[in-house]
């Protein structure tokens, strides 16, 4: 628990440091708060396959994961932003759910056993993003980098016990802010690369009663597409292309 708290504080440190500095220059004027959600497409990289059975003839058993386009998941989060000129620091803590499946094929002398195993992994994640945006009045396109710590939430699915609890990812994001005067929309996409194997080496065979496979060493990567609604405590400079004066 202490290690997890230390990791969370490490992720929050840049934001906390910036917030302390910003108190002298109008902290609330640099704050945006909102909420968002979106879809993700999980992409599995099989680092090393494992099997309960050993084929003495030398034939390799089939282990294949579902294609990225089929692995549709979702995420819901609170979004907190601090901005200074063109630099934006973003936190998006929330629940991130990933879906994918594994196809196993084992050839016995009398029959071939095929098995499709679905997975649902739900994480509480704290992504930290650093963005650089270009002010084009109503639209403010940006690009940046992201680093996230995630903790796997409990599940009744036996196969989920074969995964470690902690997960780190890094990646790149791009998108645009849309200034709608009273609210700001944030539309973005990002690719998140798993930084380590997420399979528990000690529990890879605990896939559930009757299962004929062991858990492979895998990386959990993914593409995320999100839409957020933000509320700024600072009066927006650009409302529309046509202003009304009285």
Regions picked out by a protein language model, each given a short descriptive name:
Residues 26-32, 39, 82-88, 123, ...:
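Strand-connecting loop/turn motifs
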Residues 31-35, 89-91, 126, 141-147, ...:
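Transmembrane beta-strands of outer-membrane beta-barrel proteins
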Residues 180-246:
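Predominantly the C-terminal beta-signal and adjacent terminal strand-loop region
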Residues 45-67, 98-121, 151-166, 198-217, ...:
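Flexible, solvent-exposed loop segments that connect beta-strands
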Residues 79-155, 226-231:
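Gram-negative (and chloroplast) outer-membrane scaffold detector with strong preference
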Residues 23-24, 41, 84-86, 130-136, ...:
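Outer-membrane beta-barrel proteins
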Residues 22-77, 230-238, 243-246:
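Short glycine/proline- and aromatic-enriched beta-strand/turn motifs that initiate or cap beta-hairpins
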Residues 29-31, 70-76, 120-126, 139, ...:
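Residues that define the transmembrane beta-barrel architecture of outer-membrane proteins
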């Amino acid at each position: 628990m202490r290690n997890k708290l230390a990791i969370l504080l490490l992720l929050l440190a840049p934001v906390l440091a910036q917030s302390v500095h910003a108190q002298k220059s109008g902290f609330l004027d640099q704050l945006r708060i909102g909420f968002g959600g979106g879809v993700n497409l999980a992409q599995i990289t099989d680092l090393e396959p494992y099997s309960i059975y050993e084929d003495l003839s030398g034939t390799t058993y089939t282990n294949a994961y579902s294609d990225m386009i089929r692995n549709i998941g979702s995420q819901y989060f609170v979004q907190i932003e601090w901005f200074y000129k063109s630099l934006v620091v973003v936190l998006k803590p929330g629940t991130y759910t990933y879906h994918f499946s594994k196809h196993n094929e084992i050839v016995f002398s009398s029959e071939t056993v095929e098995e499709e195993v679905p997975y649902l992994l739900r994480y509480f994640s704290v992504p930290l993003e650093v963005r650089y945006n270009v002010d084009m009045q109503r639209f403010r396109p940006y690009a940046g980098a992201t680093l996230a710590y995630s903790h796997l939430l409990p599940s009744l699915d036996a196969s989920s016990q074969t995964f470690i609890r902690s997960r780190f990812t890094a990646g790149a994001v791009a998108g645009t802010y849309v200034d709608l005067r009273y609210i700001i929309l944030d539309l973005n996409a990002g690719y998140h690369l798993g930084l380590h194997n997420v399979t528990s080496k000690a529990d890879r065979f605990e896939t559930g009663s009757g299962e004929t496979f062991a858990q492979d060493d895998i990386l959990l990567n993914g593409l995320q597409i999100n839409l957020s609604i933000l509320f700024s405590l600072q009066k927006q400079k650009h409302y529309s292309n046509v202003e009304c004066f009285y």
